[in-house]
């Protein structure tokens, strides 16, 4: 299977890339700036450096034509969610653009969201609870969640290192 991983150098993306790097899948790893680090531990992949703040993701999707897109892109709290324009573009709009392309081309999308879509005041949240984030990160990630027949959105709570 041809798999495109977006945000391949982030907390989630680099572990998925590392795991799938030992498979027989054809991998395309996108990192805005750090593909040289990925190349140190994944040798059987193609690398791209699209910056989705400046470039249209559909260019990369059309160029690579993956069967599966794994979207791990996100403007996190410590990486500038206070720059609301970037958070809106990457956390909120980008997933819907990818989902639209995936649906149009009969491809699959796995999109990573976050438990930060919840304020934390209620506790014991389920997937049926309404999003009630109070910060820019949670608000934009919540609005970026995709519900489509060809899409799996995963709300995860990840704390860890990036490359």
Question: Where in the sequence are the language-model features?
Answer:
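Flexible, glycine-rich beta-alpha linker
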Residues: 118-121, 154-163
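SDR active-site strand-loop-helix element
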Residues: 6, 30, 69-73, 109-115, ...
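N-terminal Rossmann-fold cofactor-binding loop
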Residues: 29-38, 51-52, 74
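NAD(P)H-binding glycine-rich loop region in Rossmannoid oxidoreductase-like domains
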Residues: 46-90
